[in-house]
């Protein structure tokens, strides 16, 4: 993401002009735009024209509109963002108050104005415009007949390809059908890797599977690379890291990122940091339950006691339609930072973010036990009974 201009007043009202450069920038933009904001961008509008003879025709024109945002729609697989709202500035093609949907496009700038820019949104702009935040990890999670090729960016896990091939069982005295199907499966996975992984950007490609599938696949891939003189694969061989996974399903990616070998290799990535923080929370919940809580009320009480060491919070909560609720989460983040706590904002498009979402989207690891919080938890559960 490129920051073109930033005009924010002391009262935190103002506007920023940005240019999305990568597909992931659309995800960042989705987290920036909120209902009630005003968005100015170039768009296509179908307009009706009347000729001198009175015949009516229609054609599409490119124009710049400023909308008051009413609805936001994000397609995570295509990384497309559509913003619907009413026109609030005079335009020769569109009446004031008329509805329009802008589809934000890569490499076309837009200007976003807000009455209140909060700290979480401003921090996201800083991160989005930091060139170090790029998709530098890829993963192939596989089992016999099933593979997912994923890109792990700082903000999301993108499934770029799913490969499924029916592998017949080995039969006594006749393994040829099984072997042919397995070779066809491996070949399709190799093609998906070459199609979807940019070796100039990606620093590490994780190949994860149960059993010996990963070893057999990598042997096949590099034998074929030698045969066909595939320089790209051969030159990047050192980037491939083989690790264990319980299955070829996407959810196995979390356990892969928890693997100590992987964690040390990816120690500088945000995704690995999120996975470790969630893992630490679960361990604390198991061994010292007085120092691990989830749910907004419990976490707010822990914060009042200045007890929060690490706050885990889903970015989904900052997209809440209710301004008061959204502000409550922002205040919690600001307060934890002011009290020297660490804040981890999880992407809801990461596997770890999905898991945090199942724990209400907000959790905390405490510096010291707060037994009264456990008592309150017991009281509330007995009241429910």
UniProtKB/Swiss-Prot annotation:
Cross-linked sites for Glycyl lysine isopeptide (Lys-Gly) (interchain with G-Cter in SUMO2): 162
InterPro entries: eFR1_2_sf, eRF1_1_Pelota, eRF1_2, eRF1_3, Pelota/DOM34_N, Ribosomal_eL30-like_sf, Transl-rel_pelota
Any coiled-coil regions, as ranges: none
Modified residues (Phosphoserine): 374, 380-382
Cofactor requirement: a divalent metal cation
Assembly: Component of the Pelota-HBS1L complex, also named Dom34-Hbs1 complex, composed of PELO and HBS1L. Interacts with PINK1. Interacts with ABCE1. Interacts with CNOT4.
Protein name per its UniProtKB record: Protein pelota homolog
Top-level taxonomy: Eukaryota, Metazoa, Chordata, Craniata, Vertebrata
Gene that produces this protein: Pelo
């Amino acid at each position: 993401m490129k920051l073109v201009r930033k005009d924010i007043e002391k009262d935190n009202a103002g506007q920023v002009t940005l240019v999305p450069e990568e597909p992931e920038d659309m995800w960042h933009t989705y987290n920036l735009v909120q209902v009630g904001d005003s968005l100015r961008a170039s768009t296509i509008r179908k307009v009706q024209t009347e000729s001198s003879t009175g015949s009516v025709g229609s054609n599409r024109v490119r124009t710049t509109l400023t909308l008051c945002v009413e609805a936001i729609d994000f397609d995570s697989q295509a990384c497309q963002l559509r913003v619907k709202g009413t026109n609030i500035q005079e335009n020769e093609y569109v009446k004031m108050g008329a509805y329009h949907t802008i589809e934000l496009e890569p490499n076309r700038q837009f200007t976003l104005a807000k009455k209140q820019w909060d700290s979480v949104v401003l921090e996201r702009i800083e991160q989005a415009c930091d060139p170090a935040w790029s998709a530098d990890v890829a993963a192939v999670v596989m089992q016999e007949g099933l593979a997912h090729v994923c890109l792990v960016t700082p903000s999301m896990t993108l499934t770029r390809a799913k490969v499924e091939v029916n592998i017949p069982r080995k039969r006594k005295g006749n393994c040829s059908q099984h072997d042919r199907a397995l070779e066809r499966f491996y070949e399709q996975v190799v093609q998906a890797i070459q199609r979807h992984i940019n070796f100039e950007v990606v620093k590490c490609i994780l190949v994860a599977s149960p059993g010996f599938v990963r070893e057999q696949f990598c042997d096949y891939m590099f034998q074929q690379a030698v045969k066909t003189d595939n320089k790209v694969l051969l030159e990047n061989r050192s980037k491939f890291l083989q690790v264990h996974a319980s299955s070829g399903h996407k959810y196995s990616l979390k356990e892969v990122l928890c693997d100590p070998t992987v964690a040390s290799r990816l120690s500088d990535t945000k995704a690995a940091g999120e996975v470790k923080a969630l893992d630490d929370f679960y361990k604390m919940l198991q061994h010292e339950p007085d120092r691990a809580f989830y749910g907004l009320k419990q976490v707010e009480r822990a914060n009042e006691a200045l007890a929060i060491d690490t706050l885990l919070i889903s970015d989904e909560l900052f997209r809440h339609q209710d301004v008061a609720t959204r502000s409550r989460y922002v205040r919690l983040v600001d307060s934890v930072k002011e009290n020297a706590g660490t804040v981890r904002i999880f992407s809801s498009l990461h596997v770890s973010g999905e898991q945090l979402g199942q724990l209400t989207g907000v959790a905390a690891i405490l510096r010291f036990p707060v037994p009264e919080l456990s008592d309150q938890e017991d009281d509330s559960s007995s009241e429910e009974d």
